[in-house]
Structure formats: C-alpha cells, structure tokens
C-alpha cells in the first residue's frame, strides 16, 4: 500500500471541496459565486458592484432569517438597491428561491438558503467591517443579548470563524445559547452587557 501524499504538498486548500451539508468549499464555492454574480448582472448590477451586492443580499438574509419555517410571499421584495447611473438591483423572494432551486451544487441540501449564506460567510463579515455603523441593526440582536456593535452576529447562518475575534466568537456562542433558551431551563439568560464576551473558557 503506497504512502499517502504529505499534506504539505497541497499548495492551497482553496481548490479542495469537502462533503458538507452546511456550506460549499473550494471550487464548488467559486462556481456558486460565479453563478450568482451572473444572476446579479442580469438584474442590472454593474461588474464593480457585484461584491457589495452579494454582501447586501446576505445581510437581507440575516435580517429576515434563513429558517425553512420563515414564510414570505414569493412576490415580496427581497432586496432593492441603487448603484448610480440608473443601475438598480431588484430581487424578489421568489426569484431568489428560483435561483437556489436551479443550482445543482445545492441539490440535496436540507436548507439551500442557509447553505448559500454560510458558503459566503466571509463576504458577510467583510461587508460589516467595511460599512460598520451604516447598516441597519438586526432586531433580534437585542433579544439574543448582543451589544449594538456586534448586532450582525444575530444572523442565524453565521458560525465561529477565524474572521471573528475571540471576544466576538464568545458573544456569538452566548447569543446562540440565549436563542435556544427556554422558560423551562434552570439557568438564567444573559441580561446585561457585563455578562457578554467573558471569553470562551468560562464555566457557563
């Protein structure tokens, strides 16, 4: 039996696609990005605005939620944005769902929208960093015990990531705990900013 190729021989992991039900990786991620950018261009988004258009779509998903239980009318507005020079993006929920349903890369995924958003989580975080303070707050951030500066962590598709600081990741984990907290739990939910971001190594 021949020896396996050392992992150091892999120049980059960007071209590695892994079996994952929650998001796409490597070449699959690149293909999905290209397909969605083509969709955006057909909708009138200029080439140099494709990045921010994707980010805004992800932010719209964050505010609405990506649960399969979310019920919205197919004809209702998903996103509307102007890019100057008469260029405007207008996309309905039905059009977004049609795009997701047409992607073979998403076949078999239990939640296509959430998989799509998690695939481009880095773009979502980058948008927040670039336009910090300009984006409308996500309403459920308060309910989850998140401070205003990190309201974007209330997105139900975001996961722990190297793009987030340890403090932000600890806040994210506490917010998830609060989101699943029930009235029958014996533990009290976070109720003050002092309880937030105490580090990942806490006993709570």
UniProtKB/Swiss-Prot annotation:
Family: Belongs to the closteroviridae capsid protein family.
Protein name (database record): Capsid protein
Residue stretches of biased makeup (Polar residues): 183-194
Keywords from the UniProt entry: Capsid protein, Helical capsid protein, Transport, Viral movement protein, Virion
Region Disordered, annotated ranges: 183-204
GO cellular component term of the entry, any: helical viral capsid
Task performed by this protein: Component that constitutes the body part of the virion. Also acts as a movement protein that is involved in local cell-cell movement via plamodesmata. At least five viral proteins, CP, CPm, p6, p64 and Hsp70h are essential for cell-cell movement.
Localization terms from the record: Virion
Superkingdom of source: Viruses
Keyword Transport listed: yes
GO biological process, one term: transport of virus in host, cell to cell
